[in-house]
Amino acid sequence: MDQNANQPRQERPSVRLEKLQHWARHKQSGRLLVLAVSQVWLAIAMVPFTISVSCLTSACHLVTALPLWPGASGLLTGIITLELRRAPCIWKVRAMMISNTFNLILGFVAVVIEVMKTALGTASMDSSQSTGLLVLELSAEAFTLAGVLVSTYALFLLSQRKPGYFKRSRLQYRELQEGLSEMEEVSGLENGPVVASTGNRTDE
């Protein structure tokens, strides 16, 4: 009896794994596949545009090819998503969440920097030279921004894996508040007769 009372109210690992397998293989299998394919495709598609821009602006110095870094992160994230769909596991969910968060931040920073570089570079170049370069830069930025949006949707999809969590938390908080208010009412009723008897003794 005591063991059952002291046992934490948490799901067993086997039950959690079964729910995760149902979520990844049946409920969200199609969406995970679309996410993984989109991330891998965007990561590969931005490579030629980024290298072309780098070769035209800085003699093929890949260090300046900033969109390559979120592209590599997106490729890794897509592989993790495919692995989660193939063989669901708790640590893969955490790895997918961390990689998507990192990819979102890195991609957003890359987009902001590339947009600023494009705006400043276009103003200083001739119109005949800037047209082709502008198309390549905008294409690389569009693919990077698409990767950011895909990572955002992936994080949203992961947050919906346990939709009742926040509702249960609010319900427990409400029950706790009601319990505290009931305790205050009971303590007030218990202190009432004591105060009244003290007043009667004072009058006597």
From Swiss-Prot:
It is found in: Membrane. Residues 184-204 are annotated as: Disordered. Keywords: Membrane, Transmembrane, Transmembrane helix. InterPro entries: TMEM253 (IPR038874). The chain crosses the membrane at residues 33-53, 62-82, 96-116, 138-158. It comes from the Eukaryota. This is Transmembrane protein 253. It is a multi-pass membrane protein. The keyword Nucleotide-binding does not apply. One of its GO terms (cellular component) is membrane. The keyword Metal-binding does not apply. The gene is Tmem253.
